[in-house]
Amino acid sequence: MKVTLIAILTCAAVLVLHTTAAEELEAESQLMEVGMPDTELAAVDEERLFECSVSCEIEKEGNKDYKKKKCKGGWKYKFNMCVKV
């Protein structure tokens, strides 16, 4: 009985792994077809470009010397504004 259960579970695991691998290969083959536009890849490239431009802007803005505002009466300067402490 235990051997049968182990065999069934093993077959199920192999089937799941095989199905997953087949889906990955099919997705890769669709991306590699010559006639198809690479919209998925273009979206990834666009996202990376956006991330790069944002990080570059942060680096540029980070080098500027900002004058901290003076906050009074129990207020503390944080996040470019006075916050109650």
UniProtKB/Swiss-Prot annotation:
Pro-segment residues?
A: 23-48
Q: Does the keyword Signal apply?
A: yes
> Could you name the Gene Ontology cellular component terms for this entry?
extracellular region; host cell postsynaptic membrane
What subcellular locations does the record give? Answer: Secreted
Tissue expression summary: Expressed by the venom gland.
The superkingdom listed in its UniProt entry is: Eukaryota
Please list which residues make up the signal peptide.
1-22
Q: Which family does it belong to?
A: Belongs to the neurotoxin 12 (Hwtx-2) family. 02 (Hwtx-2) subfamily.
Please give the name of this protein.
U4-theraphotoxin-Hhn1f
Species assigned in the record: Cyriopagopus hainanus
